[in-house]
């Protein structure tokens, strides 16, 4: 073997441990950043509760026996039709999470349909367990979020365009146009969870004390009482 071949071989051998280490680190990062646990089988169609929703268990949900799973278990038509936007927000949200679509159990994904009337808004909220992609199908939506540094990021998103929202950050969708708008929102969790900002603060049960909210927002307690009256269940 020539000296150049020997050097090339030695270089490749010395690079091998670094490559292995890099792959190992990336694998660990991927597993720690995943929103849901990794699946250990091809699928695990969730077993619904008597009321129709899946029965929670961690990680994931109880599995329907594989021998009883059929093609229709992997089909979901719940997002095909628009919901009613005849409400104070001018918005409709149809969930496609594991509770609505049991086949998503252990798959680490979910999808929602958002319909907004002109001037309608999907109010400020956050998803503690997932990042989100907002893909506009028809119309336009102003989509925005606020970072932990207090910086506001936003974009008017048109048909066929997509906007990314990082996990856990407060965000919204708003229809600035004169026609209805529709979007599909996709999550990297089968059950992203949702924390509506206004409802969490002013509609909590039991109530957050007026004094705490008044001091936090630097407003009079009467304003807090008025806001709470809008969100009482």
UniProtKB/Swiss-Prot annotation:
Upper taxonomic lineage: Eukaryota, Viridiplantae, Streptophyta, Embryophyta, Tracheophyta
Location of the Cupin type-1 domain: 77-225
Chief subcellular location: secreted
Residue pairs linked by disulfide bridges in the UniProt entry: 44-63
CDD domains documented for this protein: cupin_OxOx
Matches recorded under InterPro entries: Cupin_1 (IPR006045), Germin (IPR001929), Germin_Mn-BS (IPR019780), RmlC-like_jellyroll (IPR014710), RmlC_Cupin_sf (IPR011051)
Alphabetical list of SUPFAM superfamilies matching this protein: RmlC-like cupins
UniProt-recorded name of the protein: Germin-like protein 3-7
A Pfam family this chain is assigned to: Cupin_1
Positions bound to Mn(2+): 125, 127, 132, 171
